[in-house]
Design a protein with these regions (language model features):
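Membrane-interacting alpha-helical segments
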Residues: 1-11
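Active-site and donor-binding regions of nucleotide-sugar-utilizing enzymes
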Residues: 9-32, 36-207, 227-229
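Charged active-site motifs of nucleotide-sugar-dependent glycosyltransferases
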Residues: 37-43, 215-222, 232-234
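Generic structural signal for well-ordered alpha-helices
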Residues: 59, 236-239
């Protein structure tokens, strides 16, 4: 894995030509940080834009339940990092997702010593879960989802994926179907809690704009938002 690091660096520099943020803080991806080691971080991994927005909803409850909590936020994409930056308060830290390599992950856990890890939706990385166990960091999958296709892909690599899902301390599923598939992979599903995204509260400006558009419509309008692969065709068949 260490031999592949130059290739990853080259890929990041190339991607930074279109999205400059990919070229910043590259060393964080390899477990090298400027922050000093502290303990008791609540670590949330929100890989991209959608997960970062879900993390905002989750954080509202966490900060109420744990006043003064210190957030360690990791992201994998530039859009995720940009959105995640909006969630930071004084004392919080944001770094890139560490590469799924034993030495990199060990440096990450030794640097921050998180109290727990909350992974959002589908972000289960075998080595990440395994090294978290080694370092005594309980990890949980929140707002968890698992499509039939993703389950089939995971089942092709049982030696890797089953220990990863079984190694999670707890899993909180969105739907009954998600829960059943996750249990099939060995996950400790604690229950069905719906989709956190439905708890989002639009601000007053958005609500007013929506009402304005609605009053201007002269014909019925149907909108599909945040659809998954295959859902558009199913909707068209139903109509």
């Amino acid at each position: 894995m260490r031999l592949a690091q130059p290739l990853l660096r080259r890929k990041l520099h190339k991607r930074a030509q279109a999205e400059p943020l990919y070229g910043q803080f590259i060393e964080e991806r390899f477990g090298h940080y400027t922050q000093s080691a502290r303990q008791d971080w609540i670590w949330i991994h929100a890989v991209s834009l959608g997960e970062a927005r879900t993390a905002a909803i989750l954080l509202e409850g966490l900060r109420r339940a744990m006043p003064g909590m210190r957030l360690l936020l990791t992201n994998g994409t530039a859009t995720g990092r940009e959105e995640g930056c909006k969630l930071l308060q004084d004392g919080d830290v944001q770094v890139w997702q560490p590469w799924d390599s034993p030495d990199v992950l060990d440096r990450f856990f030794l640097a921050f010593k998180p109290k727990m890890g909350l992974l959002l939706e589908t972000e289960v990385w075998p080595l990440l879960v395994q090294r978290a166990q080694v370092h005594g960091v309980p990890t949980m999958l929140v707002n968890a989802r698992m499509s039939g296709k993703s389950m089939q892909q995971a089942q092709r690599w049982p030696a890797l994926m089953r220990p990863a899902y079984a190694g999670l301390s707890a899993v909180f599923a969105q739907t009954q179907d998600d829960a059943s598939r996750l249990k099939t992979l060995g996950a400790k599903v604690q229950g069905i809690f719906g989709n956190l995204k439905f708890d989002a509260k639009p601000d007053a400006v958005q609500l007013a704009l929506g009402q304005s558009w609605r009053h201007q419509l002269t014909a019925p309008l149907v909108m599909l938002a945040s659809s998954r692969e295959g859902e558009e065709s199913s909707w068209l068949e139903a109509w």
